Structures are given as C-alpha cells and as structure tokens.
C-alpha cells in the first residue's frame, strides 16, 4: 500500500468517526451529557471528562480499531498530551501515531458549573469539533516525533451550518509537493486556502490566552504576556489587527476563521489573519499544523521557529498559525512589542 493510499484510508476513517460522534452528541439529551466520568483518554477526570465525552471516545476508538485491523498496522494513540499512549491493533513493527480529541470543547455541549437536577448550562454557540491527527507508519520513539510528522489531520465541525459560509469538515493529506487541505462535504471535496491579504489592519486575529492562566502548565510570565499581547494586537492604528476575537475550543474555529476557497470567477477568502495562542496544548497543535500548512499558512512559535520541526517531547509552547509569511512576521513583531513593553504600556 502506498503512503497516499494509506493516508486516504486514515482520513476517511477519521471523517466517518467524527461525523458519527457529531450525530451521537446531538442525539444525546442535554441532561444526560454532563455526568462526571473517567475514560481512556481522560483517566484523571476533570471538568472536561463527561459522559458524552466517554461515549464519543468509544465511537472514535471503535473506528480506530477497525482501521488498524483493515490496514494491518498498529496505532499508538496519544494520551495525556503525549505523556502516555494506548496501543490499538498490532504491537510489532512500524505503527501509526495518532491523536484524537473526540469533543474539543466538551463543556460547551455537556455543561459548565455546578450540576443541578433540573437544568444544564450549555454554551449554545455551536463551537466544538471532533479532531484527529496521524503520522504515517513509523518506528521513531514518541518523544522524537515532530509535529510535522503528523501527515494526516481531520477536524469535523460539531455544528455545520445549513448555508455554508466557511469550510466545515476539513482534512489535510500529504503529497509530493507538501500537504494539501480540503473541505469534505456531500458534494465532494474542495481545496481550501488561507487569505492572500498581507494587511493585518484589515484582518481578524483570534487570541487565545485561556491556558496562560493554567498554573500547572504555564511558563513564568505567560499571564502578563497575554495581557500585553491583547494591547499590542487590538491597537489597529499602530500595526495591530482590525479586531481581536476569542473562542474557547480552537479547532472548531480554525476553518471558520482561517480558511476559504480560491475558485473562479471570484475567490472567497477568509478575513482571518491568524490564531495566536499562549501556552497551546498538543491535542490542538497536532491537527492544526498540517491543516494550516496545507492551506498555505505558516505555523511558528513565539520565537519564529517552525512548529513542524518541534518534537513531541518538547511539550507545549506558544504559537502563531498565520495565513501567510508576511502576516507571521507582523505578528512576531507584535509579540516582541508585548514582551518588551509589558501589559500596561
């Protein structure tokens, strides 16, 4: 089996899994979704471990088990942001390393806050997704695998709109000329791209600082940097963006903000310039890097280093997923301004 054939089989399996998960979530009564639980992917529990998440996980695992059997290749599923893994199928030879976030944004569909018997508090904004990323078969140790080794990625929109204004279910596939990103719909597949605009002052930036305040994982100064970054980005008169957006559950917003179509007679481009994330986690990075690259974008850390060469063993970092090289350079300059001036200047 060629790499292209294998990658296609993997992407198709992930699309089927994501769409079945979407159906499961919408079919489950809201009052049943939020029961606290533990699962293979979330063995420690926590506010993101809910009954709906565990049920969706079972769906995803079943699809991965069938995929491993059909390909005759083992799958090593990353757990706990790469600190552990769960083997699926064969245990010998090269294996596919995979990441699966069955509901990116669990609390949006399962409820947030103290539980009550007669009510559930949902976000109701539709902003969640099922996300997957896969390497081609490899024997490399987990810690040495680079983000760019994840050649296949799929993000399935949790609430696709009836009248699509943006690419919804998206996938990245490897190719001889590099990755390519596609929208998958009932009408077939279409290439999707980031914007060609280089005018940051006419584009939106999504700034995610949620994890800058995570005391277990943040770096010293992340909290202050996040405030300074907002000040640097929102100032559209001196090199900032047109405006700054925020959405919890980044992967559901990736296609909505960054991707559009380049089809005659008129290209429909996104107004999104970039995602800027302080202290991003691996389950978000692994699908985002190939999807952004395949659409013509650029993914770097806050020091300008390409994310594609970053190894799993290096863990979290702060990132920029930019529409193009020019936008990336402008945003790196904003990062430097935030670092040098501090939050209140």
Annotate each predicted stretch with a short phrase:
Residues 91-176:
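DPxDG-like acidic metal-binding loop motif
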Residues 1-104, 109-112, 333, 340-345:
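N-terminal subdomain of lithium-sensitive/metallo-dependent phosphomonoesterases centered on the IMPase/IPPase/PAP
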Residues 47-55, 124, 248-251, 282-286:
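Short, conserved micro-motifs enriched in small and acidic residues
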Residues 2-5, 9, 44, 48, ...:
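Alpha-helix capping and helix-coil boundary motifs
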Residues 14, 21, 25, 154-161, ...:
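An extended, acidic
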């Amino acid at each position: 089996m060629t790499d292209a054939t294998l990658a296609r089989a993997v992407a198709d399996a992930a699309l089927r899994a994501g769409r079945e998960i979407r159906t499961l979530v919408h079919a489950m009564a809201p009052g049943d979704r939020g029961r606290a639980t533990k699962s293979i992917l979330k063995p420690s529990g926590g506010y993101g471990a809910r009954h709906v998440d565990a049920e969706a996980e079972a769906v995803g695992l079943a699809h991965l088990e069938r995929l491993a059997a059909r390909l005759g290749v083992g799958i090593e599923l990353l757990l706990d942001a790469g600190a552990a893994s769960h083997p699926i199928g064969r245990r010998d030879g090269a294996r596919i390393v995979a990441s699966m976030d069955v509901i990116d944004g669990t609390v949006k569909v399962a409820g947030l806050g103290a539980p009550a018997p007669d009510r559930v508090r949902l976000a109701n904004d539709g902003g969640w997704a099922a996300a997957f990323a896969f390497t081609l078969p490899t024997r490399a140790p987990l810690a040495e695998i680079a983000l760019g080794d994840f050649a296949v990625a799929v993000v399935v929109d949790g609430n696709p709109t009836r009248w699509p204004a943006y690419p919804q279910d998206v996938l990245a596939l490897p190719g001889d000329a590099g990755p390519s990103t596609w929208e998958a719909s009932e009408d077939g597949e279409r290439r999707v791209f980031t914007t060609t605009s280089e005018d940051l002052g006419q584009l939106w930036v999504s700034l995610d600082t949620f994890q800058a305040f995570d005391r277990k994982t943040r770096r010293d100064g992340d909290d202050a940097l996040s405030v300074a970054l907002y000040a640097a980005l929102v100032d559209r008169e001196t090199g900032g963006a047109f405006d700054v957006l925020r959405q919890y559950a980044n992967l559901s917003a990736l296609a909505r903000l960054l991707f559009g179509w380049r089809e005659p007679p008129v290209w429909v481009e996104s107004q999104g310039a970039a995602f800027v994330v302080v202290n991003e986690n691996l389950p978000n990075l692994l699908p985002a890097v190939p999807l952004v690259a395949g659409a013509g974008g650029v993914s770097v850390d806050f020091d300008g280093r390409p994310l594609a060469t970053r190894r799993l063993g290096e863990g979290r970092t702060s990132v920029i997923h930019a529409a193009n090289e020019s936008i990336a350079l402008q945003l790196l300059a904003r990062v430097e301004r935030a670092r040098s001036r501090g939050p209140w200047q």
